[in-house]
Amino acid sequence: ALADTALRQCLPCGPGNRGRCFGPGICCGVELGGCYVGTAETRRCAEEDYLPSPCQPGGQPCGSGGRCAADGVCCSADTCAADASCLEEGSERAEEAAEKNLTVLDGSAGDLLLRLMQLAGRQQGRQPGLL
């Protein structure tokens, strides 16, 4: 009975069967460089609906019930989205994302500092008792 409920790996798909099905119209793989959605490469994935046992795509859990499907991509059975938690460590895209986050952080910190200085300057220029 346990073998009946065990999840199997989803069907291979895409060019050279280098991807895995994530839904009836989604085929993804690191070797594919991303995902095919609703294309000829996903036709085989529709067969999953007719197989008696459920499958679970590989990859770490991500997003809302999805799994990491390719570098920086999280997919559920219905959709795919960019997800930084799916970036492979050390990949060029992971390094770019880290740099962008650092830049955003630096920009926010700079904006905050500038705003605080402006507020401090206004406070110094005011006379006591005036609003």
UniProtKB/Swiss-Prot annotation:
This is Neurophysin 2. Belongs to the vasopressin/oxytocin family. SUPFAM superfamilies: Neurophysin II (SSF49606). Disulfide bonds join C10-C55, C13-C27, C21-C45, C28-C35, C62-C74, C68-C86, C75-C80. The keyword Lipid metabolism does not apply. Pfam families: Hormone_5. Neurophysin 2 specifically binds vasopressin. Keywords: Cleavage on pair of basic residues, Disulfide bond, Secreted. One of its GO terms (cellular component) is extracellular space. The keyword Disulfide bond applies.
